[in-house]
Amino acid sequence: MRVHAAFTPTGCNRGVSRIGTAFVVRIALAGAALAVVLGVVRVVLVQQAALTRRRIGKPLGEDSLDADRVWRRSLGGEPLELLVLGDSIAAGLGAERRKETLGARLAKATGRRLQRPVRLRTVAVVGSESPDLPSQFDALPEGYLPHVAVIVVGGNDVTHRLPPALSAQHLHEVIRRLRGMDAEVVVGTCPDLGALRAVPQPLRRIASGLSRRLAEIQAETARRAGAEPVDLRRAVGPMFFDEPEAMFSLDRFHPSALGYRRTAEALLPAVCRAAERSLSSPRPQETR
């Protein structure tokens, strides 16, 4: 009896070899196609990022208003020391009057709640990222001891694609140093960048996901380091999504006076709790 070559071991091997080769070819083609798609996506995202920078520009400049002073001075008594660190939101870029900045709004509202003056000191710098926080701390004068420190940072970490672990590391470091001064710390987590209408899709969707993830990491980091986090995405994000014309300033990136008001209102309960804890504890005598 003759056996057809296709059913001999050699024939089987050839068939398997042909199938294996075809499979490898398909995988290679799929991989090449995916690489092309990813390359196209990368080019599109780079182009969209450049478009976003052109759209937003810098109509507000890079200098925020100086709101540092004693607020609610007429209430009398020893002022509460309020320190603000972070990026352009913390610095108040976009506010047209100093009383509209985030720090000033927090100082005024906290003073009213506690019925005492509040001395505001702002070391936040426009354009800052989380790795800049330690240098902001280092800029404090010798012997300065804040009762409460507020940190708002993260947007530039996302737009400049900083690794979240790096952002968390520097946030943890500055919280630890502030806590070492017996300061109570409040952290406003990264806002949802999906609210930025000036950013085209799909870049806006990607930025939204990245900012949400960073906010989660910031909240966990803050709690572990002894600070109280405030989820700004949940607290004020819907307002920025629903009323962008009112909540954003003319650059469509930074908050307007109303945007800062709503952000301060979201932070205020945590700031007041922090102030009450600090005021009820003995102040350290030693300097930094």
PLM regions: where:
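Residue-level recognition of beta-strand->loop/alpha-helix junctions
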Residues: T122-A124, T189, D231-R234
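A short helix->loop->beta-strand "cap" motif at the edges of active sites that frequently abuts
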Residues: M181-A183
